[in-house]
A protein has these predicted regions:
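Small/polar-rich, solvent-exposed N-terminal microdomains that initiate assembly or binding
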Residues: 1-90, 180-181
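Short, cationic low-complexity segments
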Residues: 128-129, 177-181
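Short, well-structured alpha-helical interface segments that form or flank functional binding sites
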Residues: 23, 74, 95, 117, ...
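Residue-level recognition of well-ordered beta-strand positions that form the cores
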Residues: 80-82, 99-103, 160-164
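Acidic-leaning, charged glycine-interspersed low-complexity segments
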Residues: 116-171
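Short, flexible/disordered intra-domain loops and linkers
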Residues: 16, 109-117
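Short acidic, glycine/tyrosine-flanked loop/strand segments centered on an H-E-D-like triad
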Residues: 95-111
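Short, solvent-exposed beta-strand/turn "edge" segments of beta-rich domains on protein surfaces
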Residues: 87-93, 150-154
C-alpha cells in the first residue's frame, strides 16, 4: 500500500465504527466546534470565534492534559472516551463513557456577561449539547457532574455521560472481504 493509501485509510477511521474512540471523538469535536455558545464561552484572547476549528488543539483537547507553561490565561474542554465491562451474560453490548474535563484559569473564572463561574457555564452548555441524545447511535445520559481543582491556577468540573452500546461487533469491510466472512 502506498503512503497516500495508508493516510486515507487512517483518516477513514473518523467516519466509521471500527474504532469507537476515534469515531466518538470526531462526533464530540464536531459538536463542540459547531456550538458558537461553547466557543464564545471559552473566552479565547488569541483565537477568533468565527474560526472555531482553530480551537481544536488549543482549547478543545481530545485527551486530558493541559499545557504546563502559558503566557495567557486559558480555558479548556478536554474530552475522552472509555469502553468497559460487558453487561453480565451479554457479549453483544458494552458500557461506554464520554468524559469531559472542563478546566478554567482562575484569573478569568467568571464569565463577565453572565456572572456565572465559567466552568459551570461550560458544563451546562456541554450537558445541553449531549445529555439524552442519540449522537453516538445509542442514547447517552449524564451520570456524574463533579467539581475538581487542578492546582492553585485552575479549577474545573468533570462530566461523565454513559451509554450501553454494541460491543465491537462491526469488522472492517476489507478484513471481511479478504477472509471471506
Amino acid at each position: 500500500m502506498s503512503k497516500n493509501e495508508n493516510l486515507k485509510n487512517n483518516i477513514d477511521y473518523k467516519k466509521h465504527y471500527e474504532n469507537d474512540n476515534i469515531f466518538y471523538k470526531e462526533i464530540i469535536k464536531e459538536r463542540l466546534i459547531n456550538n458558537s455558545n461553547i466557543i464564545e464561552s471559552l473566552n479565547s484572547k488569541e483565537l477568533d470565534p468565527e474560526c472555531p476549528a482553530d480551537y481544536m488543539g488549543e482549547h478543545l483537547l481530545p485527551f486530558y492534559m493541559i499545557y504546563p507553561t502559558q503566557d495567557q490565561a486559558k480555558n479548556y474542554i478536554c474530552f475522552d472516551t472509555s469502553f468497559q465491562e460487558i453487561p453480565r451474560y451479554n457479549k453483544i453490548m458494552k458500557y461506554g463513557q464520554i468524559i469531559f474535563n472542563i478546566v478554567c484559569d482562575i484569573k478569568e473564572i467568571y464569565d463577565k456577561n453572565t456572572g456565572i463561574a465559567r466552568h459551570d457555564l461550560l458544563a451546562a452548555l456541554i450537558s445541553k449539547e449531549f445529555d439524552w441524545t442519540n449522537l453516538f447511535g445509542m442514547q447517552v445520559h449524564l451520570v456524574s457532574d463533579k467539581p475538581m481543582s487542578v492546582d492553585n491556577n485552575y479549577i474545573g468540573r468533570t462530566l461523565i455521560f454513559e451509554q450501553t452500546t454494541p460491543n465491537s461487533i462491526i469488522k472492517e469491510q476489507k478484513v471481511i472481504n479478504k477472509s471471506g466472512g
